[in-house]
């Protein structure tokens, strides 16, 4: 709601603003996933210590995944790594001069939606909605919105714009 207010007040396109923000947002999410590790929450299925060692998981993470007498899959780590990869992709293409407004937002929604869908499938402590976990339902909606912003909406738009060119988002001091 604040983003909508800010963009309206400063006469900035909501999607253009989001295209700039999502690059840092996915990096923040990659870092934020480590909070799940420190809080020992949002972990995966029970596993063995040897399986974690075979996956070349660092020892401090293996130790942290020992909860209530069992070892668990470090789903926070999988999601953090995938979010970092998503950050690299968004970071590399963000300055491509022929992006349509909303494309980066759509790509973020697709990447993060797919990542969350699969990682949630590995978690053992999720809220269920029928056969799917609630977060997976939200992920499907994110993917659908992302496809809309990346492809369907952009097919109609003929305008390309460099997000970081002079005259982009106004900064008032």
Question: Whereabouts are the PLM-identified features?
Answer:
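A feature for loop-to-transmembrane-helix boundaries and adjacent hydrophobic helices
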Residues: 1-173
């Amino acid at each position: 709601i604040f983003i909508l207010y800010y963009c309206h007040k400063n006469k900035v396109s909501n999607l253009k603003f989001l295209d700039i923000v999502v690059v840092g947002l996915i990096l923040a999410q990659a870092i934020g996933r480590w909070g799940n590790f420190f809080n020992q929450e949002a972990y995966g299925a029970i596993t063995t210590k040897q399986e974690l060692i075979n996956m070349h998981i660092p020892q401090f993470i293996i130790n942290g995944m020992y909860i209530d007498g069992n070892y668990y899959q470090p789903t926070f780590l999988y999601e953090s790594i995938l979010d970092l990869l998503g950050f690299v992709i968004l970071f590399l293409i963000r300055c491509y001069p022929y992006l349509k407004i909303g494309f980066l937002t759509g790509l973020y929604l697709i990447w993060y939606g797919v990542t969350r869908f699969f990682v949630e499938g590995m978690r053992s402590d999720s809220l269920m909605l029928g056969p799917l976990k609630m977060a997976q339902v939200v992920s499907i909606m994110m993917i659908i919105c992302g496809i809309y912003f990346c492809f369907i909406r952009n097919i109609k738009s003929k305008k390309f714009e460099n997000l970081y060119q002079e005259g982009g988002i106004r900064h008032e001091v």
